[in-house]
A protein has these predicted regions:
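Loop-to-helix junctions at membrane interfaces in multi-pass transport proteins
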Residues: 2-4, 41-46, 50, 67-81, ...
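Helix-loop-helix module between adjacent transmembrane segments
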Residues: 56, 78-173, 229, 233, ...
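Transmembrane helix-loop boundary segments of multi-pass membrane transporters
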Residues: 2-7, 70-83, 143-158, 178-187, ...
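Extracellular loop-to-transmembrane helix junctions
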Residues: 2-27, 33, 70-106, 110-111, ...
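Hydrophobic, small-residue-rich membrane helices and short re-entrant helix-turn-helix hairpins
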Residues: 37, 106-114, 176-186, 261-291, ...
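Residue-level recognition of pore/gate-forming positions within transmembrane alpha-helices
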Residues: 15-18, 58-59, 86-90, 130, ...
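Juxtamembrane interface elements at the cytosolic ends of transmembrane helices
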Residues: 16-35, 65, 96-110, 167-170, ...
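Membrane-interface "cap" regions at the ends of multi-pass membrane proteins
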Residues: 1-65, 172-175, 194, 281
Length: 383
């Protein structure tokens, strides 16, 4: 993709905005103490809109934009099944899980396991989750994020990895969860804005000058097969979708774990002002999940209807950015992709720091550590 000067200015402005907001909200107020609750749980003072936005920002990464658009191109709207089931999962977690977690006043999920079982279970799961987060989640977000940026924007892989890690680390290490959550609100605006703009332009082009509604109508006619939610067994994408038995069975195990027991998702709800704020935040996140197909899958179907000359379906979203978006808007779209990566990285870094500090450092290495030392350990580990 060719990047114009205007696009570059828009992207740099986005980076500066995120850094400035992150550093600004990281400042300690007058009389504010330097303790674990303030750093890891934002002083237990997050509002519902910050919780919901931060959950979505943590969940979505750049490879999801590219991958789900590619699935929309190859399979169609049926891929939205995963997103819609996730929205229902968020409702269940909000209703049944959140009141229990907040009543316990825990920092981490291993702490909950200690209360429910014993210290041995907590320790085993703390080390397990640290290994998964560090060696699987964090590395995959960095690699796939840098790979996506390399494919879309031509940024070298190594430079992308270093730049993304440094960008996410600057404000997340300094400001803790408060900085992560409040900058996530801005990230979500870019995510939704970039996705909506791409969808609008694609549908407008399909409308042949008659508007977006006409474009969507034409899309439904030109790609009618892409709007089936249940596929025939002969369809090449049949095995990529969950069957009925999976939807009512095994998928819920993964769904409820991810939204209800996954530290870097549930930590936002643990930082809520109250149970109602946490529940409303998760409801807000569920509402946004319902919109994700509009932002991600529909553009892929539009690329199919526009006869995009692709070698692989995953090229659908990059093709739309390269060929449809005007100067200036490309910068917003690139900022949206970067926002998806940076928000996920910052959330993962903060959660790794939280689990190690609260479940290992405070429990075994320095059980008598004062709050200032616990806070310092969290910041040092993030570095």
């Amino acid at each position: 993709m060719n990047i114009s000067t205007i696009d570059l200015i828009v992207f740099i402005a986005y980076c500066l905005l995120i850094l400035l907001v992150g550093l600004f909200v990281s400042r300690r107020g007058k009389g504010e103490t330097q303790d674990a609750s303030n750093y890891f749980l934002a002083g237990r003072g997050l509002a519902w809109w910050a919780i919901g936005a931060s959950i979505i920002a943590s969940n979505i990464s750049a490879e999801q934009f590219v991958g789900m658009s590619g699935s929309g191109y190859a399979i169609g709207l049926a891929m939205a099944t995963y997103e819609w089931i996730a929205a229902l999962g968020l409702l269940i977690v909000a209703k049944f899980f959140i009141p229990i977690f907040l009543e316990k006043k825990i920092f981490t999920m291993p702490q909950f396991l200690e209360e429910r079982f014993d210290r041995r279970v907590k320790t085993v799961m703390a080390f397990f989750w640290l290994a998964v987060f560090i060696f699987i989640n964090l590395t995959s977000i960095l690699y796939l994020g840098a790979l996506t940026i390399e494919n879309v924007m031509g940024v070298p892989m190594l430079a992308g990895i270093i730049g993304l890690a440094a960008f996410a680390g600057i404000y997340s290490i300094y400001g803790g969860l408060k900085a992560v959550a409040l900058t996530d609100v801005i990230q979500v605006v870019f995510l939704i804005g970039g996705g909506l703009i791409t969808t609008y332009i694609a549908l407008d082009m399909l409308g042949n000058g008659e508007g977006v509604i006409s474009g969507f109508t034409n899309l439904c006619h030109q790609a009618e097969d892409k709007f089936h939610l249940i596929l025939d067994k002969s369809h090449p994408g049949y095995m990529d979708l969950p069957g009925v038995s999976v939807i009512i069975g095994g998928l819920w195990v993964a769904n409820l774990y991810y939204w209800g027991c996954n530290q870097y998702i549930i930590q936002r709800a643990l930082a809520a002002k109250s149970v109602s704020e946490a529940q409303n935040g998760m409801l807000f996140a569920g509402f946004i999940k319902l919109l994700i197909p509009l932002l991600v899958v529909i553009p892929g179907i539009a690329a199919f209807a526009l006869d995009a000359p692709l070698e692989k379906s995953d090229e659908a979203y990059p093709w739309l950015l390269s060929n449809l978006l005007p100067v200036g808007v490309k910068g917003i779209a690139f900022a949206a992709l970067t926002a998806a990566i940076v928000s996920s990285l910052a959330s993962m870094m903060n959660s790794i720091s939280t689990i190690f500090t609260m479940d290992i450092y405070r429990s075994y290495l320095r059980p008598k550590a004062v709050e200032r030392d616990v806070d310092a350990c969290g910041r040092m580990l993030g570095q």
